[in-house]
Amino acid sequence: MDGSGEQLGGGGPTSSEQIMKTGAFLLQGFIQDRAGRMAGETPELTLEQPPQDASTKKLSECLRRIGDELDSNMELQRMIADVDTDSPREVFFRVAADMFADGNFNWGRVVALFYFASKLVLKALCTKVPELIRTIMGWTLDFLRERLLVWIQDQGGWDGLLSYFGTPTWQTVTIFVAGVLTASLTIWKKMG
């Protein structure tokens, strides 16, 4: 930061380029963290990590804590385990679209999207389909760019995530995120 609220080398915190760059970094870090907890070292996920500023470290920690809470939601884990990954692209985009179908955007839903993407990546790791990993990450970033970018810009960039999750308790947040993802998976199963 140069004191003006602008981040060096990518426009301000609400520029499309900076939001996508930060989003890609957060998604990669989130997926690597989830995979590392499940499978230990995952060379398929070893990606170049740019240096983190204090804000990005806080965002990463926020996502990690929410992910830890979601991992302990057994109903959500059961539903995700039941997702058929024979056509993962269709599954991903249908669930992602269902999460935002009502036109109401919020940080809980963005985190739910990241969490769902991480679970699909972990399934790909378990089924030894490593080429699917980068593909799922690409789908997530495409969805972010096409459907969520303007909303994230309107929230002041990724720092809005910290403001959103700074007030309620973690249990409240994770119950909300788990509810969004569970509802989306339920709708997807009924339609599929």
UniProtKB/Swiss-Prot annotation:
The chain crosses the membrane at residues 172-192. Expressed in a wide variety of tissues, with highest levels in the testis and ovary. There is a cross-link at K128, K190 (Glycyl lysine isopeptide (Lys-Gly) (interchain with G-Cter in ubiquitin)). A motif (BH1) lies at residues 98-118. A motif (BH2) lies at residues 150-165. Ubiquitinated in the absence of XRCC6/Ku70. Ubiquitinated on Lys-128 and Lys-190. 'Lys-63'-linked polyubiquitin chains on Lys-128 are removed by USP12. The modification N-acetylmethionine is found at M1. Keywords: Acetylation, Apoptosis, Cytoplasm, Isopeptide bond, Membrane, Mitochondrion, Mitochondrion outer membrane, Nucleus, Transmembrane, Transmembrane helix, Ubl conjugation. Intact BH3 motif is required by BIK, BID, BAK, BAD and BAX for their pro-apoptotic activity and for their interaction with anti-apoptotic members of the Bcl-2 family. Belongs to the Bcl-2 family. Accelerates programmed cell death by binding to, and antagonizing the apoptosis repressor BCL2 or its adenovirus homolog E1B 19k protein. Under stress conditions, undergoes a conformation change that causes translocation to the mitochondrion membrane, leading to the release of cytochrome c that then triggers apoptosis. Promotes activation of CASP3, and thereby apoptosis. This is Apoptosis regulator BAX. It comes from Rattus norvegicus (Rat).
